[in-house]
Design a protein with these regions (language model features):
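Glycan-recognition surfaces
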Residues: 34-145
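Loop/turn elements at helix/coil->beta-strand transitions in domains of secreted/extracellular proteins
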Residues: 1, 28-34, 52-54, 193-196
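Carbohydrate-binding surface patches
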Residues: 134-137, 142-144, 180-219
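Catalytic cores of secreted or luminal carbohydrate-active enzymes
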Residues: 129-179
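Soluble non-cytosolic domains of exported or imported proteins
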Residues: 12-17, 126-127
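A cross-family glycoside hydrolase active-site/sugar-binding cleft signature
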Residues: 4, 36-38, 199
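Alpha-helical scaffolding segments of alpha/beta enzyme cores, especially the outer helices
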Residues: 17-24, 28
Length: 219
């Protein structure tokens, strides 16, 4: 159940009991249900959504189908990704930060995500990066397109078993940024059995060479 909080009072003291009432009602059904809290991160739900019975909570405004919007009122993929940087401690088994749906494969389709055709989508490299970043964040990987008509490039991204395995690792840790150096961002996600997933992400719009010292840079 996704529970939107449209046109509601801005204070958390009103929001929490409303969401908890629904959370309690869902538990009483005796059926396993996923409870998604959506108030767009305005009341810092990562601090209280678990106690309200939530399993995931939106951390930002709605995502748009553009890599970077450069518009404070229209959040692109990169704007949303950057807003997750201080939230890792709140994610874990049973409760997840939700940076919104995947835009992978939309290519400007969707009236809302494209803002009525204003945004034409991303290229394949950007979509691949988007999917990997959301996997590293331990975010819910919720597809936002008609899978019956997706092209091969989109299917190859969304069905990548190794990336999905990183996202679904049972430890449930959200990746943290180790450093950003000359437009290269390095993220570390702890996995069960002491393993690590490392993401070397080029934030720039040009190819770049980068060397990672596993002994020095990962500490």
């Amino acid at each position: 159940l996704k529970y939107d909080y449209c046109n509601a009072p801005e204070d958390v003291t009103t929001a929490f009991p409303r969401y908890k009432k629904m959370g309690d009602a869902l538990k009483k059904t005796g059926r396993p249900m996923v409870y998604a809290i959506c108030e767009w991160g305005q009341r810092k739900p990562w601090l209280w959504a678990r106690a309200a019975g939530g399993h995931l909570w939106r951390t930002t405004w709605d995502s748009r189908g553009v890599w970077q919007s450069n518009n404070k009122d229209l959040t692109g993929i990169m704007e949303i990704f950057d807003q997750q940087k201080d939230l890792a401690q709140y994610a874990g088994p049973g409760g997840w930060n939700d940076p919104d749906l995947l835009m992978v494969g939309l290519y400007g389709k969707g009236k809302s995500s494209s803002v009525g055709g204003r945004f034409k989508g991303c290229n394949t490299i950007e979509y691949r990066s988007h999917f990997i970043l959301w996997a590293m964040l331990s975010a819910p990987l919720i597809v936002n397109l008609d899978v019956r008509s997706m092209d091969k490039e989109t299917a190859d991204i969304l069905l990548n078993k190794e990336i999905i395995a990183i996202n679904q690792d049972s430890l449930g840790k959200q990746a943290v940024t180790l450093f950003i150096r000359d437009n290269i961002q390095v993220l570390k996600k702890e996995l069960r059995n002491g393993d690590l997933a490392i993401c070397v992400f080029n934030r720039g719009d040009q190819p770049a060479s980068f060397s990672l010292d596993l002994k020095k840079d990962l500490n």
